[in-house]
């Protein structure tokens, strides 16, 4: 996947960022989101399955859709691209993977430093309706198990983070946080939700301080992640794009 001449240029790099999108995992059998024919959003309206409003309106339907997606992710294995990215660690002192994917395949391939901008489908967190919570009379506190808002008298003093960690995204009724009783949901970024500020700050810092950035399989249509190659380019880094079709940045990048 990585051409020999590019490998040679990368040998002089001290900090490499690899930025990946849905195309990275397509060969592992995970459909992309935006392909007009086979993408996930070609088959279902994201407003029905990937927004806080959808979960508030029909939580079981949204949960079941994510269970179906999680089943495909669990069957998937890292492809040659994931393996090649992990091997970059053998000759580049510092490699930071920044991914828009939620499938955990970079970690499965052996990449050590992975910033997951859009979360991880294999993790769960509490769904907290902050509008409803702050509209009531109760004083909200933070549940130490799920880090969501809770009402003080709902907290279980005997529950621990390990009780949440063993709960999986699987078919059946939606589980609840063992600490505060809130419904659980996939720990992914839905439409209308902001990215984790700390995660985004780490990604920006990596892009702005790297020697080189390789962009693989991203349509570069979703902000703020799409700005990462530009941030690296504007700081003088070598930026390489590996994509089957050109993107909005292709004229400014080394395109493969």
Sequence positions of predicted segments:
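Conserved catalytic core of sirtuin-type NAD+-dependent deacylases
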Residues: 1-253
